[in-house]
Design a protein with these regions (language model features):
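Generic hydrophobic, amphipathic alpha-helix propensity
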Residues: 25-34, 49, 74-78, 82, ...
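Short secondary-structure transition hinges
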Residues: 111, 115-150, 196
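Helix-turn-helix
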Residues: 29, 37-69, 73
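Hydrophobic/aromatic-rich alpha-helical bundle segments in the mid-to-C-terminal region
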Residues: 132-138, 142, 156-206, 217
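Alpha-helical DNA-contacting segments of helix-turn-helix folds
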Residues: 38, 71-78, 123, 140
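N-terminal intrinsically disordered/low-complexity leader segments
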Residues: 1-25, 217
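Hydrophobic alpha-helical connector segments
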Residues: 73, 87-119, 169-173
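Amphipathic alpha-helical linker/stalk segments
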Residues: 76-102, 138-142, 153-157
């Protein structure tokens, strides 16, 4: 009698086991896929991210039960990168005065937003998910706002600012960096005669103009 052959189901199981799979990297791959979709202006969904990641439609749901969970993970990572870049810039200039630190903060903020437009879009609007649903994102955003407020409060305490309501100065500083970043993301600068290669220089000039306007003379 000939030797017993392996059953077909067993052969299929072996094939499935040999097929490349993302294993522990699946979460990372799905986040990258969602970011790519957002950068393209495409509709983001867990199933579409799975298709881009070349995994079965059901595989992502062990990590992300819905679209909000997926986009929250993308936003939380973006915010961590954002904070890390700003903190690194400020760490390099610990002895600088508050107004110089605000300038460094503003430039770091704007450069990151200009170089990471998809990330900035996700963390700065409610287009993709309800920001309040992520405690980590809310905390990080609050800490960034507090950093802006703190730098300008230090300038006021050191007598470096012209007489003005501090809260107004802080809101104006926040509006400047956020508003400039949004103008760039939304494609406004060509209408103002500012070409793509000139935007960063314009950011520096606008920050300097703001600082000269609030600084005591």
């Amino acid at each position: 009698m000939s030797a017993r052959q392996p059953s077909r189901p067993r052969a299929r199981r072996l094939t499935a086991q040999a097929k490349p799979y993302h294993h522990g990297d699946l979460r990372r791959v799905l986040i990258d896929a969602a970011l790519q979709l957002a950068a393209e202006g495409a509709e983001v969904s867990v199933r579409e991210a799975a298709r881009r990641a070349a995994v079965s439609p059901g595989a992502p749901f062990r990590h992300f039960p819905n679209r909000d969970a997926l986009m929250a993970a993308v936003a939380e990572e973006a915010q961590r990168r954002f904070r890390a870049e700003i903190e690194a810039v400020l760490t390099e200039a610990p002895a600088a005065g508050p107004l110089a630190r605000f300038r460094a903060f503003g430039l770091a903020y704007l450069r990151w937003a200009m170089r990471n437009p998809a990330h900035f879009e996700i963390i700065s609007t409610g287009r993709y998910f309800a920001h309040g649903s992520s405690a980590d994102l809310s905390r990080d955003n609050a800490e960034l706002i507090a950093l802006t407020e703190g730098i300008l409060a230090d300038a006021a305490e050191q007598g470096l600012l012209r007489p003005a309501d501090l809260k107004q100065v802080q809101i104006a500083g926040r509006a400047l960096v956020y508003g400039f970043a949004r103008m760039n993301l939304d494609g406004h600068f060509p209408r103002w005669g500012v070409e793509q290669g000139e935007i960063e220089r314009m950011a520096e000039a606008v920050l300097d103009l703001f600082i000269s306007g609030i600084a005591k003379r």
